[in-house]
Regions:
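Core catalytic region of metal-dependent phosphoesterases/phosphodiesterases
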Residues: 1-84
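Active-site-proximal loop/helix segment associated with metal-binding centers of metalloenzymes
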Residues: 85-167
Length: 167
């Protein structure tokens, strides 16, 4: 079965596209732009939220989105309800990172090198603030409230829920 311009692929977070504006990103942008289908995705806990934030918020099918690659790759913002082909979709991406037993390290702290060395020696996974971990991985109170208001408009009944994590 061939996918067409009428088709959507939904990715439930950790897409990996928005990580760094490098040759890999450029390659994927060109590749996805040539596909007939549209990719819709919600944030995961492993996204570069600074990079995502560079794209303007827009309205699309009743909710807020960011067009990452024109009309081919579209980020569905948290707490939004979208009407697509006669069905309602509630998007709520994000999650708490589980691979941070070694901590969330900040290069700006004076003991960064020592913290990193300790985590490396203990073989504990860690993330680095604004490089491999962003506080925006978790929803804000505003996003939670907006999601509740949007669900209330639908009497808390939507056809599909698109999360990243259900735990």
């Amino acid at each position: 079965m061939e996918l067409t311009q009428e088709d959507y692929i939904i990715i439930c977070g950790d897409f990996g596209l928005c990580w760094a504006k490098d040759k890999t990103f450029e390659y994927h942008c060109k590749n996805f732009a040539e596909k007939p289908y549209t990719i819709l995705w919600v944030q995961g806990n492993h996204e570069n939220y600074d990079m995502i934030g560079e794209y303007p918020l827009e309205e699309w099918h009743g909710g807020k989105v960011r067009h990452i690659i024109r009309d081919k790759v579209i980020l569905l913002e948290r707490g939004q309800v979208f009407e697509i082909e006669g069905k309602s979709f509630f998007a709520f991406g994000g999650a708490s990172s589980h691979d941070i037993q070694g901590g969330i390290l900040d290069r700006q702290t004076v003991d960064f090198a020592e913290q990193k060395r300790r985590a490396d020696r203990a073989h504990l996974p860690y993330r680095i603030l604004q490089e491999s971990w962003w506080p925006q991985e978790l929803p804000t109170e505003g996003e939670l409230q907006e999601g509740l208001r949007n669900l209330e408009r639908y009497h808390y009944e939507v056809d599909y829920v698109v999360p990243h994590c259900c735990g």
